[in-house]
């Protein structure tokens, strides 16, 4: 009788140990069952995409499903309970049942791993399909293009380079005005009277000589520049500043140097 009582107590202790081990197994999973860390590609092409940094809804759902399945099947391969031997060469029927349960749990964990692998493959194919669809769509400018460095108005988008102007040819240049002798004599007389034309005087000359106002204005400007260059007279303000030692931009020609030598 006493031996039977001892055997019953051993079986009860074994059952309680199995239950406690099953409760601890989800916390102490094998390193092979840990969810694989998703590697992010930090290439320039990926960073410049408009959807860079956004979490995809499909990947989040897959992670949740994987966690739920791991919780349902916490046991890992190789973590089966070894049935204790209660005698020399004999084992109880409950120990055999425990070993069968561990085998079933390992099969279920392998199936769950296969399913998760299929899900990973399907998610990769979905990702490739999305990338192909995005490539067909018109390109969306990323947010960094609209910063103040590229434009004062963020809504205007990136600046576009203005096309360079073509090199001016001889045909594009304004042709020189060929004044007649009468026109030149009249312009010289007006210049001797006053070197600067008023608007009314310029309009009257244009009507009398049959010229444009711009032609008469340019002739007077060129005439003043030639006289200033020929005489070499300095401006009164320049003379005043030179007296104070604040302005002296006089240049010495080679002829002057040779004479001084």
Swiss-Prot record:
Which GO terms label this protein's molecular function in UniProt? DNA-binding transcription factor activity, RNA polymerase II-specific; RNA polymerase II cis-regulatory region sequence-specific DNA binding
Gene3D superfamilies (alphabetical): Homeodomain-like
List the record's Gene Ontology CC terms alphabetically: nucleus
Q: Which UniProt keywords apply?
A: Developmental protein, DNA-binding, Homeobox, Nucleus
Matching entries from InterPro entries are given as: Engrailed_Homeobox_TFs, HD, HD_engrailed, HD_metazoa, Homeobox-engrailed_C-terminal, Homeobox-engrailed_CS, Homeobox_CS, Homeodomain-like_sf
Instruction: Please tell me whether the keyword Nucleotidyltransferase is annotated for this protein.
Output: no
Q: Give one Pfam family, short name only.
A: Engrail_1_C_sig
Where is this gene product found?
Answer: Nucleus
Biased composition regions of type Basic and acidic residues, renumbered to the chain: 1-21, 53-72, 100-116
Q: Which residues bind DNA?
A: 172-231
The parts of the chain that form a coiled coil are none
Predominant location category = nucleus
PROSITE patterns assigned = ENGRAILED, HOMEOBOX_1, HOMEOBOX_2
Superkingdom of source:
Eukaryota
Q: Where is this region: Disordered?
A: 1-24, 53-125, 152-176
Report any one BP term from Gene Ontology.
Answer: midbrain development
Name the protein family: Belongs to the engrailed homeobox family.
What name goes with this protein? Homeobox protein engrailed-2b
Native source organism of the sequence: Danio rerio (Zebrafish)
Lineage at the top is:
Eukaryota, Metazoa, Chordata, Craniata, Vertebrata
């Amino acid at each position: 009788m006493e031996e039977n009582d001892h055997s019953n107590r051993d079986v009860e202790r074994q059952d309680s140990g199995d239950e406690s081990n099953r409760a601890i197994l989800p916390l102490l999973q094998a390193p092979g069952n840990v969810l694989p860390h998703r590697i992010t590609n930090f290439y320039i092409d990926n960073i410049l995409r408009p959807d860079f940094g956004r979490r995809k809804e499909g990947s989040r759902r897959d992670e949740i499903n994987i966690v739920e399945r791991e919780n349902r099947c916490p046991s890992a391969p190789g973590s089966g309970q070894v049935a204790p031997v209660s005698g020399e060469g004999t084992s109880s029927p409950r120990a055999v049942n425990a070993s069968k349960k561990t085998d079933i749990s390992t099969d279920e964990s392998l199936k769950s791993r296969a399913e998760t692998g299929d899900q990973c493959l399907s998610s990769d194919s979905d990702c490739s399909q999305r990338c192909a669809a995005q490539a067909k769509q018109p390109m969306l400018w990323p947010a960094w293009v609209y910063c103040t460095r590229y434009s004062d108005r963020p809504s205007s988008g990136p600046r576009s380079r203005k096309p360079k102007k073509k090199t001016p040819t001889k045909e594009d240049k304004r042709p020189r005005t060929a004044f007649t002798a009468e026109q030149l004599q009249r312009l010289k007389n007006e210049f001797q009277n006053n070197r600067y034309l008023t608007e009314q005087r310029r309009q009257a000359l244009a009507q009398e000589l049959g010229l444009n106002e711009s032609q008469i204005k340019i002739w007077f400007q060129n005439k003043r520049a030639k006289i200033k260059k020929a005489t070499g007279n300095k401006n009164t303000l320049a003379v005043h500043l030179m007296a104070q030692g604040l302005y002296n931009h006089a240049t010495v020609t080679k002829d002057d140097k040779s004479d001084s030598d």
